[in-house]
Amino acid sequence: MDLADSQITQGNEIIQSMGLTNVRLLEYFIYQVGSFTIQSLTQHIEENKEFANITENELYSAVLSLVILGYVYVYLTTYPIYSFEDNKTYIPKSFTQYVKTLVEGANQYIGAGNMYNGDVEDLNKLHLYIMSQMEKPTTKAELKSALQGYLIQNEYQDMNNNDKLIDETYDCTELFNALFDVLTRLGISSL
């Protein structure tokens, strides 16, 4: 067993020792809420009877275990996420050019990160295209329409049917939202 396997085994043992109720509580906050404080966890426990048996000591132990395993990061200040506003939100061209440099190969030397120096992976040409369209204030509807046009013009394949090219009937909402999720992690804007 190598070091990585040993750490995975250790991590699994720690998670199992937390108990199913603790794991469900923390999964909810990690995957659905996104960010939390001990106060918000405690309040949620008080408001939901299924978590009533979790003690303060168990809560702190579970959170500390997840910090050690790298599932949760602790920050002193909150990360401001700005909501997209039609005809107001824009991305400076210089930032788009920086991301373009990363997408075109500089990512082998430097990576994109958020305010907390966390990696923002999976930046690609579609993110870059959306960013370029946001160099001037626009609307969500115009961005979606531009994305659809870009997909058609560049002969992207339908993700649900690889034998079919994207056309005017393709609903790009899911893709659009996924692209914005990555941009939100980069600190640009959320939908």
UniProtKB/Swiss-Prot annotation:
It is a single-pass membrane protein. One of its GO terms (cellular component) is membrane. Keywords: Membrane, Transmembrane, Transmembrane helix. The chain crosses the membrane at residues 59-78. It is found in: Membrane. This is Uncharacterized protein HI_0096. It comes from Haemophilus influenzae (strain ATCC 51907 / DSM 11121 / KW20 / Rd).
